[in-house]
Amino acid sequence: MNLEYVQVVQKFNQVLLELTKKVCTVVGGSKPTYWYHHIRRVCSECPSMPMSMIGPYLNVYKAQILTRDKNFFMNFDPAHNEYTFIIQKLKEAARNMPEDELEQYWVKLLFLLKSYIKCKPFIN
């Protein structure tokens, strides 16, 4: 397996774990592993998307989280109901999370997702 791919996946998992801990802390969840698996499952589907879609895909969520749009989940269904559940939890967490901190996580995840896609040919 390509070393660059392995490093990207390790970083990706680390950031997801950080984000999961933040969500658990703010939302009040007592099982980080539970949240980690859900968030990981959602994000693992992102690399199958064209790279040009990843930025807009995450930015839509970020914009809705930051504006606290209560009707967001009724009006937007991103192809899989699992996404709605996770983003709802991230939205709940964002209520008490400083916007600059949330922004930092998003930037990290966006960068890592793009890196993940670039390395995708080396998975096998």
UniProtKB/Swiss-Prot annotation:
Induction: Expressed in the late phase of the viral replicative cycle. One of its GO terms (cellular component) is virion component. Keywords: Late protein, Virion. It comes from the Viruses. It is found in: Virion. Belongs to the asfivirus H124R family. This is Uncharacterized protein H124R. It comes from African swine fever virus (strain Badajoz 1971 Vero-adapted) (Ba71V).
